[in-house]
From Swiss-Prot:
Belongs to the TSR2 family. Pfam families: WGG (PF10273). This is Pre-rRNA-processing protein TSR2 homolog. Residues 118-181 are annotated as: Disordered. Keywords: rRNA processing. PANTHER family: PRE-RRNA-PROCESSING PROTEIN TSR2 HOMOLOG. One of its GO terms (biological process) is maturation of SSU-rRNA from tricistronic rRNA transcript (SSU-rRNA, 5.8S rRNA, LSU-rRNA). GO terms for cellular component: nucleus. Residues 118-133 have a biased composition (Polar residues). It comes from the Eukaryota. Residues 134-146 have a biased composition (Acidic residues). May be involved in 20S pre-rRNA processing.
Length: 181
């Protein structure tokens, strides 16, 4: 394998960046801080590390690249990738590297352009738990019931909760009976 020229290395580095920036697993890890306070810097470093891995090693197979990326994700982001996307990412990066080696830079640039368009049109994914309005109502009722129990550690005054229930119950036509303390 002949060493890549600086312009070819630059195109390959852009290709790696485009692939990783459109990979949802890495973006979720970065957006949610799985790598700590420096998650974004780790993702940028990962581009350089992967590009250097190809430069330092000859004739890499997709499974070797897959193992390397998996190790980086585990070490840097405490993330085990098991969604099936890792082989696709490795295959894509290997394919682009082979195209760069063969001097087919126009094809690689076209793929980079498509990936960048995909990135801007789809936005970034964010892993947040969804809460339905029904769940929210249940939580409020449970909190109110906990406060009414008169536990010594309650931080909400039971009179405020009782007043709230008093108003609700009076609207329904019921009479409120309170016990003495």
């Amino acid at each position: 394998m002949a060493p890549l020229s600086s312009s070819t290395r630059e195109v390959f580095s852009e290709a790696v960046r485009a692939v990783l920036e459109t990979w949802p697993v890495l973006q979720i890890a970065v957006d949610n801080g799985f790598g700590g306070a420096f998650s974004q810097q780790k993702a940028e470093w990962m581009v350089d590390a992967l590009q250097q891995y190809f430069t330092d090693n000859g004739d890499l197979q997709p499974d070797e690249v897959e193992d390397f990326i998996s190790e980086l994700m585990n070490n840097e982001f405490d993330t085990v990738v098991d969604d099936g996307s890792l082989p696709q990412v490795a295959q894509q990066v290997c394919g682009m590297f082979q195209q760069c080696e063969q001097g087919r830079l126009a094809e690689v640039r076209e793929q980079i352009l498509k990936l960048n368009q995909k990135k801007t049109s789809s936005g970034r994914a964010k892993a947040t738990p969804a809460q339905t309005p029904q769940d929210d109502d249940d939580d409020d009722e449970e909190e109110a019931m906990d406060c009414e129990g008169g536990s010594a550690g309650a931080s909400v005054s039971s009179t405020a909760v009782n007043d709230l229930h008093h108003e609700e119950e009076e609207d329904d036509g019921w009479t409120v009976v309170r016990r003495k303390k």
